[in-house]
Amino acid sequence: MLKTPLYESHLAANAKMVDFSGWSMPINYGSQIQEHNNVRENCGVFDVSHMLAVDIQGKDAEKFLRHILANDVAKLEAGKAQYGCMLNHEAGIVDDLITYKIDSENFRIVVNAGNRESDVAWFRENSQDLDVKITPQQNLAIVAVQGPKAVEIVKHTVTTEVAEEIAKLKPFTFKFFSNWMFARTGYTGEDGFEIMLPADQVADFWDNLLENGAEPAGLGARDTLRLEAGMHLYGSDMNTTTTPLERGLGWSVDLSDENRDFIGKKAYLTKKSHGITTKWTGVVLKSKGVLRAGQEIDFDNGEKGYITSGSFSPTLKVAIALAYVPKEGANPIVNIRGKELEVELVKAKFVKNGQSLI
């Protein structure tokens, strides 16, 4: 199994390790709910070094990314980041990722752990005739520091000059300091940073964060935090057979430039013109029980919806889920252990900055 540069740090913190996409990763350090609540109330630090930063450089870098991404990097200013999907020719989602624009000839993309090899292969396959260099940054570690106290804690671990600069960063902006990159991005619905730095420096940085008040958080808390924030998990909420339209991600597909042709555009437009029969939604269980991926939601007109991610919400203290359901139909229910239980359909975003949105 693959190990991140922080593997020994996790063992020292008594982490429970699990296999995630072939990586040995911490699921928790004792209490997933405590780690979740700490991110909502204070500051948690996650090892996300199983994800991969890929640098895209060259004269045709922007042209290349405008072709393989459904969002349009031409809209990005230097120093800003953008969420988007990479589609196949049938408009299915190959991956969802964040693109960071350094300048018009230099970009960085962070791809999901389970798609590291396939994404890099896709990049190479679709850049053969272009002046583009694709460099997977195998020697970078990635740490996410998240929560209302994240900025203050990170500031205490860096020089005064760096602290002043990173405090000015707005959401979805980033800045380099030598070979460290600080991005005001995250996967929790809280403020904070995702920091990319040399793998051989990350253990000391991790220790420094903990000494200054951050507490480690595992993949379990990361999953419930992102679910509360209404953020998608690749492989659970979408895959190569689903389009952005069907998963509430149509906003991330930029169709404003009619002359731009991106992979999957034709199929996407066809699907858009025909319309889709489902809608993406949040789900709240009105009684005790747990919602899980794969559960059916039954409607009074005989139609069914399906849960793609579900869990108990530590913040809201109810079971919540993300699901796709028919556009028509009322009185949704789920069947849990032989009992028919009512659920409520809500906007697919439950918590923001620690506050309930439902």
Curated annotation (Swiss-Prot):
Residues making up the signal peptide according to the UniProt record: none
HAMAP family in UniProt: GcvT
Keyword match Chaperone: no
Assembly: The glycine cleavage system is composed of four proteins: P, T, L and H.
GO CC terms of this entry: cytosol; glycine cleavage complex
Protein name: Aminomethyltransferase
Alphabetized UniProt keyword annotations: Aminotransferase, Transferase
Cited SUPFAM superfamilies: Aminomethyltransferase beta-barrel domain, Folate-binding domain
One GO term of the biological process aspect: glycine decarboxylation via glycine cleavage system
Pfam family, one: GCV_T
Family listed: Belongs to the GcvT family.
Broad class of enzyme this protein falls into: transferase
Job of this protein: The glycine cleavage system catalyzes the degradation of glycine.
Top-level taxon of origin: Bacteria
EC numbers on record: 2.1.2.10
GO molecular function: aminomethyltransferase activity; transaminase activity
Catalytic activity, reaction form: N(6)-[(R)-S(8)-aminomethyldihydrolipoyl]-L-lysyl-[protein] + (6S)-5,6,7,8-tetrahydrofolate = N(6)-[(R)-dihydrolipoyl]-L-lysyl-[protein] + (6R)-5,10-methylene-5,6,7,8-tetrahydrofolate + NH4(+)
